[in-house]
Amino acid sequence: DVTEKSRMKGIMVDNHIPTAEYMVYHNLEEIDWKKVTFPSVVKPVDCNSSKGVHRVDNIDEAKKYAAEAIGLSRTKTGLIEKFNSGNEIQVDCFVTDEKVEVIMTRQKQKIIAENGMVLQSFGSIVPAPLSDALMKEVEDIANKIAKGFKLKNTPFFYQAIVSEDNHINVLEFAPRIGGGLSYYLIKMVTGFDIVEAAIDSFLGNKVIVNKKQAKKVYSTNLLYMHPGVFHHIEGFEKLKKENIIKDLSLIHI
């Protein structure tokens, strides 16, 4: 239920977790195109990360990427959902036996999608600039996710859109630590070692969530490059010494 997006969306609807309107399909012929509004997002139901996720702005793009989604899906199933404009956030959480804790929030910086571009992020702002009312909604949604999906003693995170009129729509969630350097960022910002907590939960040890409020605003920045031979980076050590940059990681793909 947590790796297949159509079942995930169904459980969200059943548990009153706000999420975008959607339809599931197995072939293009069963799609009622009169019900598809634009812009929309097309994706396979069971691929990881942003693989096969496209914003579509017209029927031709929708048909093209709907067919691609079927081809990428292990179960040959795609999903079309309403595109909600606004700021994308990620909410990192940990649920113990007793309660759900929101550990950290971040606002993603998104590449402006055009010409069928895969939706990706080029960085984030930590913590996300959310009002007290929105933080209360963030916490309520985290509790609904934990209850609806019967989560106990596990890290999880969810991604959502905060609309211009301050409503939250959940995109998806995963019962694990966020990918990439999330574990490092969470520990640096909040002091909470989410990897150690996850291991303790797997071993049956009691997890105590001790975290601190972020005293600074952090920015992560992803630099994408064209294929080539990497040589070196200049100026990083100087910026790190001056405490302008906290750290840098090189990821080879």
Residue ranges of predicted features:
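Short beta-strand-to-loop capping motifs
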Residues: 57-58, 93, 223-226
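Short, conserved loop/turn and helix-capping segments at secondary-structure boundaries
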Residues: 2, 56-59, 185-192
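Short helix-to-loop capping/linker segments positioned immediately adjacent to catalytic or ligand/cofactor-binding
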Residues: 77-78, 144-149, 206-211
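Active-site nucleotide/adenylate-binding loops and adjacent lid/helix of ATP-dependent enzymes
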Residues: 3-79, 84-86, 96-98, 128-144
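ATP-dependent carboxylate/phosphate-activation module, predominantly the ATP-grasp catalytic core
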Residues: 82-89, 93-151, 155, 162, ...
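Conserved protein kinase catalytic/activation segment
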Residues: 167-168
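Peripheral (often C-terminal) accessory segments that flank ATP-dependent C-N-forming ligase machineries
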Residues: 31, 197-251
